[in-house]
């Protein structure tokens, strides 16, 4: 998870001059359409690019950890949790609520940042992501973005990782739908209360 936070912050620092949407990619179709922060014609290509990027990142991790995977089995840590999110306790309604609330808080905070000085926004967003991880990470692993879970889960399924366990696809809808709902609700709430 620390790797994901560090990569997010590095991504933020590398994109300081981009729009609010591009400064933080944890938005979705609903928030894009409602806030008009991103052109519609770029929504699908951006979603595909994010998923492909997450897939490539998971592939790099699989190559890096390959010797460890050969020596371990699913009971020893060689599982999808290295790549994608998963529940500590499998209770879909609570897991979904955790993803909705975590994403709601993230998107609402990003929208509230508004015109914050570009150099400070990545720091604040990085701290926010770390805080959400400490608060909600134990319950579901906090996807916050469907691509962040789907791409690595797909990589885990496809790649020839030795001794691997199941990819837990029956859970995959939670980190996909939860962030979409949470971000959509955050945007609607922001529009209702913003001056």
Where are these regions (language model features)?
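Membrane-interface helix-loop junctions and terminal tails of multi-pass membrane proteins
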Residues: 1-195
């Amino acid at each position: 998870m620390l790797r994901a936070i560090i990569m997010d912050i590095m991504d933020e620092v590398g994109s300081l001059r981009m729009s609010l949407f591009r400064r933080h990619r944890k938005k979705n179709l609903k928030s894009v359409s409602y806030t008009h922060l991103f052109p519609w014609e770029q929504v699908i290509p951006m979603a595909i690019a994010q998923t492909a990027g997450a897939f490539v990142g998971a592939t790099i991790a699989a190559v890096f950890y390959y010797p460890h995977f050969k020596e371990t089995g699913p009971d020893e840590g060689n599982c999808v949790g290295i790549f994608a999110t998963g529940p500590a306790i499998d209770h879909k309604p609570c897991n979904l609520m955790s993803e909705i609330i975590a994403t709601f808080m993230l998107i609402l905070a990003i929208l509230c940042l508004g015109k914050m000085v570009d150099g400070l926004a990545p720091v604040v967003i990085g701290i926010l992501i770390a805080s959400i991880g400490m608060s909600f990470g134990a319950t579901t692993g906090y996807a916050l973005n469907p691509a962040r879970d789907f791409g690595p889960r797909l990589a885990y399924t496809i790649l020839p990782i030795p001794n691997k366990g199941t990819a837990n696809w029956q859970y995959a809808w939670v980190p996909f739908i939860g962030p979409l709902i949470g971000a959509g609700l955050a945007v609607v709430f922001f529009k209702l209360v913003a001056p």
